[in-house]
Amino acid sequence: MAVSRLLILICLYSFVTFAYPKVTQDYRNHLPIKFAKRSEVTPNTSLAQCPKYVTVYSSGSSHYISTIYPVNKTHHTEYTTLTDGSIDTYTITAKTDTGTDVVVVETSANTITTTLYSGSLEFTTTLDSANGTTPATIEVVEPAAGTVTTTIYSGTTPFNTTLASATDTVPGTVEVVEPEAGTVTTTVYSGTQEYTTTLATASGTVSGTVEVVDTAAGTVTTTIYSGTTPFNTTLASATDTVPGTVEVVEPEAGTVTTTVYSGTQEYTTTLATASGTVSGTVEVVDTAAGTVTTTIYSGTTPFNTTLASATDTVPGTVEVVEPEAGTVTTTVYSGTQEYTTTLATASGTVSGTVEVVDTAAGTVTTTIYSGTTPFNTTLASATDTVPGTVEVVEPEAGTVTTTVYSGTQEYTTTLATASGTVSGTVEVVDTAAGTVTTTIYSGTTPFNTTLASATDTVPGTVEVVEPEAGTVTTTVYSGTQEYTTTLATASGTVSGTVEVVDTAAGTVTTTIYSGTTPFNTTLASATDTVPGTVEVVEPEAGTVTTTVYSGTQEYTTTLATASGTVSGTVEVVDTAAGTVTTTIYSGTTPFNTTLASATDTVPGTVEVVEPEAGTVTTTVYSGTQEYTTTLATASGTVSGTVEVIEPAAGTVTTTVYSGTQEYTTTLATASGTVSGTVEVIEPAAGTVTSTVYSGTQEYTTTLATASGTVSGTVEVIEPAAGTVTTTVYSGTQEYTTTLATASGTVSGTVEVIEPAAGTVTTTVYSGSEVYTTTLASASESVPGTVEVVDPEAGSVTTTIYSGSVEYTTVLADASGSVTGTVEVVEPAAGTVTTTVYSGSEVYTTTLASASESVPGTVEVVDPEAGSVTTTIYSGSVEYTTVLADASGSVTGTVEVVEPAAGTVTGTLTSGSQFFTTTIAQASGSVSGNVEVIEPSGSTVTSTIYSGSESFTTTLAVGSGTIPGTVEVILPAPTTIYTGTVATTITYSSSSTPVSTVVVIPTAVCSGVRGLQYAVYNYDISASKSKFCVSSGNTDVAAFTQPAYFGSSSLDQSSPLFTGVLSSTAALPEWTSSYYLPDYPPDATAMESTRCNCKAIVYQFFFRVPYTDTYELNVYNVDDVFYGWFGDKAISGWSNTNYDAYAYWHVTTGQTGMGSFSMGTLTQGSFLPIRLIVANGGGKGGFNFDFSSSTDTYAATSYAYTATCTQSFLPFGLGNGGIDN
């Protein structure tokens, strides 16, 4: 529907004056000269008078004229319908006595305005578009009282919305079910409060429906995701009959789910996404009450899911059995709490079924894995009758095995994965209560397993013999306890059997060393006739290296295994008592093992000789001693060389662990068909590096991995001496790292620039210390270079964290097919930037991201020194940011204009401070530039907020097929046209449109008419006995604290009487009486209340009729009067800064009077005025008016309770310094 509108201002305002002479005073007998009672002149407000506004609308074949007459604070609207063709003219007659007409230039079409906020009221918004060709409707369901809703989003879809509801019959509609009363939903947050949101977006071409099921009261849900798939959703529910639908079962009441979080609270989420081409169904089974589940994953597979359940009859389905009540599962976490998760994903091409067996109560399970296989799973179980099955024998009660964890608690898991090409089933036997099992692996092999056992009659089976009591074996663990595991893996093509023989009690085995030989290994022996043999070089004296162990002894090893085309035999020679052995491996070989011994007569068989009693073997560990290792593994058909550089003497390196000691390592792995070299640069003496751990000590590492078909070199630059780097950890110490990873077909080089001496960098952590990092990643087919610019010495940068300390970072990410360079400009010295955080400190950041096919450059402009910018935060401090996002097919440049010095901008906030921002977003097929105009100095803008302060914003969004530029326009100044104004204006349907379109504001602000008053008891204890006398004369000099009444220092909870005297009400005259005046709204009660020991406070704005000098005239003052003019009448009035004072004269018995100058005032301006009159005993009285050089004006004729920009606080609030 094409709508054109012509809005014409014909409102001409005229002031009403009161023409009666000034009152003069006869000072000879102290009496005012009384005139006849003045007749009150009231402004004519009939509908035939101005001001009024006329709007002419043309819609299709109909024409409409609306005439609006504002009457006080309401409007009366009349509509006239015009017809097509030859129509009568429409004539409006108006008058003016100023000869001035105000014309406001129309704001540009397509402007979208909205207000997002939170608090205790119901707020909703609809985002409209100027693209009039879209028939769809966007509706915002009214949230329950107290509900807080908001969203930030961008993309290529021309219309976006949040919490929108539509009908089920519209293809591609989005429906958000109204959340329960009191439910809080949101997107980005931080701190110790629970924040939640449910986001759903539907594709215009999808015929299905995306529905968000009602979340139980108190449930917290959220998600953050990105990618190149045009439509994503979270917590979505659809019918079971729709192919590829996604259903999220309503979690039990009290369940907490989330994705991104920080601090010491538990946050969790359950994410499920279905593939459009999968005919099966993905279902999330109800999680037991109190269960916490979450996952984070990445890769190139378009569809992933977590905690998904389907029926057994559907090929390739995935089922997660409901864990026992109280079980805790999770993936990413920090601090000293237990977090656990169980992850399972099914492959579309697998005909079998993956099942997760119920875990015993109290058992903690988890896994982390990566690779290019689209589907992985953990904790899988199958039947014993299928050839090639994998079985995990139930370990003895008390056995501890685990994978990823932190703190001083025990965490446990058992992991098993089946291969897509194996027709058998993978089964995980119930683990005994308290048992901990786990594994970590990586590579391109689709399926790996740990702790597997099968029968002796099945070819290729793997059996783990129950170790003797007291034997210690383990994989991943932390704390001061002993954790144990025995690992064995069978190869699919091996016809023999892998057996782990009971280890003798008390035997300890290990081998740790390092050197300059390209290949090192421990407990490995091969024949001289086999190509690719493994040799153990004698390490240099004093070198310490290790991999797997536990306890208070030092155990060390370096393991390397060659795989692929070796036809020989790997033999593990008996180690002497006290030796510790273990293995971590990766590559393209389907099955690997450690602690293996082969016989000379069996080709390729592996046997583990029973170690002596008391032997300790492990993989990942912790304790109170220093443990170190360097691990490198060559795999597949790699023709290059894997080299472990000899660390300098005294260097400490290690892999995974936690505790109270320093553990560090440097790990490099080559995989696939890479013909290049993976090299770990020798860190400088004294440098500390580490990977995964937790505790109270400093842990650091530098990690580099080459993958895929990359022919280049992955190099970790030697950090400067004294630099501290690290990756994942928690605790109260400083942990930092610099991480770079090359992926896909990138032929370039990924380099981590050596940060300046003293710079601190880090990635993920929590606690009360400063943590910072700089992270750069190159992805997919980008042939360029990703570089992290050296921050200036002393600069602080960081990414995710929480606490009360300042954390900051600068992050840049290149994605898609961008051929340019992503650069983070070096911020000026002293600039503070950051992304996500919470607390009471100032945090700031500037973030820019390039997306999809944009060939340009994303640049973060240097903010001026001292400027403060930020994105997401909460607290009581001011936080601000400037954010720009390029989307879709925009070929231009996204630039964040440098705001002027002193400008404050912000996005999401809460609290009692001012928060402001300016946001601009480009969408659809816009080929122009998206620009955020530099706001003028001291301009304040804002978007989302809550609290007791004023917040404002300007938001512009471009939509549809507009090829131009989306710009936030600075409002033009009001244009005043003077001259002769016609009293009659004629319009017709055939009139030629004017060249300038005139817009009338929908609500012209001229203030709110009225005068406020409040009556109080006189309760100032210091002067009450002298002022409030029951007999004799009032001591007027005793009343010296006039600012007390109406202020926050007042002890009375509320006035005795309060109200507003309107322009048509009686003048506030108080003739001499023993009773209070009869003011509305309760005149009867007031005039029957005695006025002794009472005080009346008046507050109002005086609107100036004409430019002139003015005075306040008071009469009949009985007993004491004070007055304040200007801004101090609103806030800051005191007992000593009053502008007017009069009192009853005890010697003559005459009432007080006087005239007090208010200065020269401009026509139309507003002057704040506060007056107080108090009566001690006997009669009371008071009257006042205003006068200029020519006229006198009644008190209420020009009194206003509020202006367009100012208002008084309620009586009893504000102004604490009354004694100043």
Curated annotation (Swiss-Prot):
The keyword Repeat applies. Residues 110-973 are annotated as: 24 X 36 AA approximate tandem repeats. It is found in: Cell surface. Residues 1-21 form the signal peptide. Residues 1039-1202 form the PA14 domain. Sequence repeats lie at residues 110-145, 146-181, 182-217, 218-253, 254-289, 290-325, 326-361, 362-397, 398-433, 434-469, 470-505, 506-541, 542-577, 578-613, 614-649, 650-685, 686-721, 722-757, 758-793, 794-829, 830-865, 866-901, 902-937, 938-973. Keywords: Glycoprotein, Repeat, Signal. Pfam families: GLEYA. PROSITE patterns: PA14. InterPro entries: GLEYA_adhesin_domain, Haem_d1_sf, PA14/GLEYA, S_pombe_Mam3/Map4, WD40/YVTN_repeat-like_dom_sf, WD40_repeat_dom_sf. Its main location: other. Glycans are attached at residues 44, 72, 131, 160, 232, 304, 376, 448, 520, 592. GO terms for cellular component: cell surface. GO terms for biological process: flocculation. Belongs to the mam3/map4 family. May be involved in agglutination during conjugation or other aspects of colony formation. This is Putative cell agglutination protein SPAPB2C8.01. It comes from Schizosaccharomyces pombe (strain 972 / ATCC 24843) (Fission yeast).
